[in-house]
Amino acid sequence: MRIAFVTDPLGGLDPSIDTSVGLMHAAAGRGAEVWVTQAHLLEAVHGRARALARRMRLAPSRPAGDHRWTVAKRWYTVTEPRHVWLDEMSAVFMRTEPPVDQAYVTATLILDLIDPARTPVINDPRGLRACSEHLLGLRFPDL
């Protein structure tokens, strides 16, 4: 099983509480290869979604209470980047934070090229464009 995560730069994630890191640990704990990339590293090639990605290995972690984890200072290692076809992954997680910019929108359009019957994309790119959690509040200015 190979799972790709489209995330923000790893150095900006807080591994003690970040849910993307928690999902990576859960995947690795179940024997999956964890691959990481960023939105601007996705591309469409001959109608397929491809990413420049790195295989990630996570240092062990353990629960610390208050929904946090105790992690090593060097909480991951990664391989050299290589091109991978995202439709050959077992699943792809879209896990980036704002801004919702051109790279983000383009990444969701590229992820649309993946057949969800073959490779699930979590969070659905169409849903992210139609109802982004980062922009949804703008629809309710009175709140």
How would you label these PLM feature ranges?
Residues 1-4:
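Extreme N-terminal starter segment of soluble prokaryotic enzymes
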Residues 7-8:
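Extended, domain-scale alpha-helical bundle/helix-rich regions
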Residues 11-143:
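Conserved N-proximal alpha/beta basic substrate-recognition cap immediately N-terminal to
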